[in-house]
Swiss-Prot record:
Belongs to the HFCD (homooligomeric flavin containing Cys decarboxylase) superfamily. InterPro entries: Flavin_trans-like, Flavoprotein. This is Phosphopantothenoylcysteine decarboxylase subunit SIS2. Residues 121-134 have a biased composition (Low complexity). Keywords: Coenzyme A biosynthesis, Cytoplasm, Nucleus, Phosphoprotein, Protein phosphatase inhibitor. Pfam families: Flavoprotein (PF02441). It comes from Saccharomyces cerevisiae (strain ATCC 204508 / S288c) (Baker's yeast). GO terms for molecular function: catalytic activity; FMN binding; identical protein binding; protein serine/threonine phosphatase inhibitor activity. Residues 1-10, 44-63, 99-113, 142-156 have a biased composition (Polar residues).
């Protein structure tokens, strides 16, 4: 598209020279005018032929300068740019709207505009500015003796450029505000004709996005002091350090399993072996070491373990009834023996443990759970316990642990166990069973795949009624208690023991002080003895001197001695 502007050569020299209204066309062909045919004309705008003259579209008089056209990417002619760069700028083609009479005022504005174009497309050359008006264009009829001129009203940006003063910050802010997209774009192009003069309000085609406008306002440096909008300082969220509880969840779902009582929680598991009766002395020993206010112990019994306790309890009842019968023989009516059944007696009475020790059996798993929202017992026991000690451990339960079976309460707890807490196993079985290949394979599986499980080495003892001695008996219960204490952090120091240690240290210090005093006294006595000896020696020397003097005074005596 080309726009041709001409002025009448016959007009008065004093008449202000104005820019002709560009003639727009939607066709792809350009109207090329030869330089020779255009003699007498003042300027030709957007001509593709080099060496043409153009008038800067300003509101005041302007002088003609030599221009050079550039070609854009589409092959059509672009905007007319100045060959001579403005002072202080790099040699990059830039569109200028300068007036020589207002050159000093327009220098800073030109640099601001060039910087904004670079900000808009940093990786490409500055796009030429086109003053084309989209939509329908006004066609001016060619009448003779009629001055067809166009008085170009500046856009809001141009109007603000006129009032720009580089020494005032407010003017710079006003320009930046004017260059925003909502103010720089014009929605209509009104054209009015008065006295054969066409006045067109031509908008500029510079389009800026909100992001580019913000970058343009913030990236201008060294030219104009523009106060950019301060960025919001990101609020640093205070990270609250996470407090890791000792257990997974301190919520108490069962009053029999308090999670936040501040005690050590030891869970014993007993299986069907003759060593099951050692559970009572182990519990008693642990309570003596820590005290009831610092340790809480609960016990899980398998079905086989309860059989051992029930049989022993039944035998005791039978013996007591026999004694009653013997005592009642002297009476008229004999006493009837009472044989309790497992359902009639309390399990705590059968096991003969202190009443504060909680016992669990397989039936308790179903008694505690009635509906979907009720807690599951083996999960609650797993949450409650700090350590699990299975003593004694039979070959049956060992196989279940190695294979991952969970068909009772104890194996369900082991299967759902948290690996962060230890499990101690104390095997108790016949020597031939412990030395079998299957047992060795299962122990090897536990050792390799369950690092949180520790298997104690059994002891040698008489294993059966035949008197055979073999390896397979449960470790001595004192050693088991010792290993439990070491897993829990070692033996605690009581206040009494600390007081005794302090008293012993004080006694030792007093003894050392008394010994030092005695040694000092002995040294003083020795010094006194030495002083006495020295005095005696001095007296002897004085006596000898006196004798010598006497002999010197009486020479006759000396002669007699000779």
């Amino acid at each position: 598209m080309t726009a041709v502007a001409s002025t009448s050569g016959k007009q008065d020299a004093d008449h202000n020279q104005s820019i002709e209204c560009p003639r727009f066309s939607r066709g792809q062909k350009e109207i090329l005018l030869d330089h020779e045919d255009a003699k007498g004309k003042d300027s030709i705008i957007n001509s593709p032929v080099s060496g043409r003259q153009s008038i800067s579209p300003t509101l005041s008089n302007a002088t003609t300068t030599t221009t050079k056209s550039i070609m854009n990417a589409t092959g059509t002619s672009g905007a007319v740019v100045s060959n001579t760069p403005e002072p202080g700028l790099k040699r990059v083609p830039a569109v200028t709207f300068s007036d020589l009479k207002q050159q000093q005022k327009q220098d800073s504005l030109t640099q601001l505009k060039n910087d904004s174009e670079r900000t808009k497309s940093p990786n490409s050359n500055p796009a030429p500015v086109s003053n084309s008006i989209p939509g329908n264009h006004a066609v001016i009829p060619n009448h003779t003796n009629t001055s067809r001129t166009t008085q170009l009203s500046g856009s809001p940006l141009v109007n603000e450029m006129k009032d720009y003063d580089p020494k005032k910050k407010d003017s710079a802010l006003k320009i930046v505000d004017t260059m925003k997209p909502d103010k720089i774009m014009a929605t209509s192009t009104p054209i009015s004709r008065e006295n054969n003069k066409v006045t067109a309000k031509a908008p500029t085609s510079i389009t800026l996005r909100k992001e580019d406008a913000q970058d343009q306002a913030n990236n201008v440096s060294g030219q104009i002091n523009v106060r950019s909008t301060p960025e919001e300082t990101p609020v640093k969220q205070s990270v609250i350090p996470s407090i890791i509880p000792k257990r997974e969840n301190s919520k108490n779902l069962d009053p029999r399993l308090p999670q936040d009582d501040g005690k050590l929680h030891v869970l014993f598991g007993a299986t069907g072996s003759l060593s099951v009766f050692k559970i009572k002395p182990m519990i008693k020993k642990l309570e003596e070491i820590y005290g009831r206010d610092r340790i809480s112990i609960q016990v899980i019994l398998t079905q086989s373990a309860t059989q051992f306790f029930e049989q022993r309890y039944t035998k005791k009842i039978i013996k007591s009834s026999e004694k009653l019968n013997k005592m009642s023989q002297y009476e008229s009516t004999p006493a009837t023996p009472v044989t309790p059944t497992p359902g009639q007696c309390n399990m705590a009475q059968v096991v003969e443990l202190p009443p504060h020790i909680q016992l669990w059996t397989d039936q308790d798993e179903w008694d505690a759970w009635k509906q979907r929202t009720d807690p599951v017992l083996h999960i609650e026991l797993r949450r409650w316990a700090d350590i699990l000690v299975v003593a004694p451990l039979t070959a049956n339960t060992l196989s279940k642990i190695a294979l991952g079976l969970c068909d009772n309460l104890l194996t369900s707890v082991i299967r759902a166990w948290n690996p962060s807490y230890p499990i101690l196993l104390a095997p108790s079985m016949v020597s031939s069973t412990f030395n079998s290949m299957m047992t060795k394979k299962q122990l090897q599986t536990i050792k390799e795949e369950m690092s949180w499980v520790t298997v104690f080495k059994p002891s040698e003892k008489v294993m059966d009624i035949n008197g055979d001695i073999g390896l397979g008996g449960m470790m001595d219960w004192n050693e088991i208690v010792n290993k439990i204490v070491m897993k829990l952090g070692g033996y605690p120091k009581n206040n009494e023991e600390e007081d005794d240690d302090e008293d012993e240290e004080e006694d030792d210090d007093e003894e050392e002080d008394t010994e030092d005093k005695n040694e000092n006294n002995n040294d003083d006595d020795d010094d006194d003895d030495d002083d006495d000896d020295d005095d005696d020696d001095d007296d002897d020397d004085d006596d000898d001197d006196d004798e010598d003097e006497d002999e010197a005074e009486t020479p006759g005596i000396i002669d007699k001695h000779q």
